[in-house]
Amino acid sequence: MTVSRFQMLARSLGVAGMVLIACVAKGDVAAKYAEPEGGEVKNGVFEDDYFGLRYRLPSGWVEDLKGPEPSASGYYSLAALKPEGELVATMQISAQDDFFAPEPAKDATGFLNAMKKGLDTSLSAPKAVAHVKLGGIDFARLDYSGAGLSHIVLATEIRCHALIFSITARREAAAEMLVESLRKLSFMQERSATSSNDTAVRGGWPLCVPESSYSDHIAHKVDPVMTGPRYGSVPVRLIIGADGKLEHIHAIAGFPEQVKSVTEALAKWEFKPYIANGQPVEVETGLLFQFPSAPPQRNSGE
């Protein structure tokens, strides 16, 4: 059985941006904060603490090969699932960081509409993107088919990420069976808000704030030392406490020496508390550090 074109595209994007991951925390807080790529299958249940996600695999299903490391565009291959016996269907669980997406979408519906527009002409997607509720959370749903395979992609927004479940099956009934299994999803915390309200605080997650809305809260910063290969980039997620102290640095991707340069610089940054509804709150934001090419060298005779 072949994988869906969407899965191949997603994996190829991940491979293209495959780099060493570095997770650096200020002080002794590394174990306190989960990261998206930390999900795993344990005793038949896929668990990802960053998204608060718990998904019990259908009976007879197992984890397939591990996917690529997170990419420079913030794409995560979280888990690939398959049946132990005949390969009648597959499921890919992935996530796209909204802060670093090549073409950021406003919401999960926009994400799937963009995907639909980008489908190969050999694929058929006559239905509009629909909406379903899975595990008490609103998801957008895209159905398409081609080459004798049925595809269903489900997406929702959590912590400024598109969380994606991609299903490929030989028969439509097998695909729908997997959708039914997703109705038993559980989320340990409520979804994080993307605006300044108390939803994220009630849910126990930091408030998700884009860089454009948080830049005024940077009180002091130190630029990273320009090092490593030309044209490199390091996307970073930061968690800043309600008191304005830097709590966690997650360098998503990057060349090792550039990741080291960025994290060492960030450890010296200072922030102002972020106020939401009159109260200082913990926030999560994203920054992209670019490493430009070295300036041209002058001839010794100039």
Where are these regions (language model features)?
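Charge-biased low-complexity segments
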Residues: 29, 33, 63-65, 71-88, ...
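Bacterial N-terminal signal peptides
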Residues: 12-22
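Bacterial N-terminal signal peptides that target proteins for export
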Residues: 2-14
